[in-house]
């Protein structure tokens, strides 16, 4: 038995002696492998923006994309940054408009003077912030459709947000009825509304639902049809313009300017559809164009 043990021991020792030089020879290879460098400049800023987008920190994503989107001359990341900004801003404009309108209804419905005053303040604050976002959306839409043209294909290169938005902001149901919600619920509504709206925007961009958007974005960079995206931009800017109508902030000048930019997006879509006709897109484009005309008549 002792001889058997010795033979086994010596065999293991020989294997260790053989393996040791091999393992040691690999160490320089591992040690000398260059670290993966993080992109700098516009590439680094865009990477930071997509990271923030994936974490549902949309305001930070807007901060990181601002200089890239406004670069002159444009760089390799400029159009990508503009697409990402358009999606975030479109969702946030819708969210803050929804918040403002809910507090407006709450102020009208409540019988409590204190609630009324608080809800009127929240109405004003949300409409004011939403209007700034609407102007930002109009700016990026103008950049993407300059001269009534848009790229035939655009790219959304970002992860799907890891924090999923709700299907509805339940806190606002009580608000609309004139009931009171505490500051914690107000803050949660202010978080949930943009998350919900941006998830809905992503579904709209892929012409499907949230699950389709999530699956397509997980598969890699999402290619977007130019005509489709121009129609999306036009509808988004027109929605932002409504914050300046008589029912909201009543600023006819800004309302007309945004309607003009929505019309520019519509013309960009029309130019592409002239080259490649598509009945479904043409139908949606006509609906957008008719809505722009109708809204301008009501200024």
Regions found by a protein language model. Give the residues of each.
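Bacterial Sec signal peptide processing site at the extreme N-terminus
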Residues: 32-48
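"A position-specific structural signal for the A-helix of alpha-solenoid helical repeats
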Residues: 47, 84, 91, 98, ...
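Short solvent-exposed coil/turn linkers within tandem alpha-helical repeat scaffolds
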Residues: 36-39, 68-80, 110-121, 125-197, ...
């Amino acid at each position: 038995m002792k001889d058997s043990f010795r033979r086994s021991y010596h065999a293991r020792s020989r294997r260790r002696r053989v393996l040791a030089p091999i393992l040691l020879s690999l160490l320089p290879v591992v040690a000398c492998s260059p670290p993966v460098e993080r992109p700098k400049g516009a590439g680094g800023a865009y990477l930071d923006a997509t990271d923030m987008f994936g974490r549902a920190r949309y305001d930070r994503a807007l901060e990181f994309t601002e200089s890239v989107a406004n670069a002159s001359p444009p760089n390799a990341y400029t159009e990508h940054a503009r697409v990402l900004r358009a999606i975030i801003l479109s969702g946030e404009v819708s969210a803050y408009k929804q918040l403002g309108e809910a507090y407006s209804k709450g102020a009208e419905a409540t019988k409590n003077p204190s609630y009324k005053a608080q809800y009127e303040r929240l109405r004003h604050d949300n409409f004011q912030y939403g209007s700034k976002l609407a102007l930002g959306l109009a700016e990026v839409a103008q950049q993407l459709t300059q001269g009534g043209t848009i790229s035939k294909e655009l790219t959304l290169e970002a992860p799907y947000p890891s924090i999923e938005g709700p299907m509805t902001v339940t806190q606002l149901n009580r608000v609309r009825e004139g009931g009171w919600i505490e500051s914690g619920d107000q803050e949660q509504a202010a978080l949930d509304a943009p998350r919900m709206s941006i998830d809905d925007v992503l579904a709209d961009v892929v012409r499907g639902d949230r699950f389709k958007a999530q699956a397509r974005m997980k598969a890699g960079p999402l290619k977007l049809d130019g005509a489709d995206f121009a129609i999306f931009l036009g509808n988004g800017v027109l929605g932002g313009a409504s914050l300046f109508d008589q029912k909201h902030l009543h600023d006819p000048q800004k309302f007309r300017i945004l309607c003009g930019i929505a019309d520019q997006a519509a013309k960009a879509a029309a130019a592409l559809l002239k080259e490649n006709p598509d009945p479904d897109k043409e139908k949606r484009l006509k609906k957008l164009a008719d809505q722009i005309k109708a809204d301008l008549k009501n200024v």
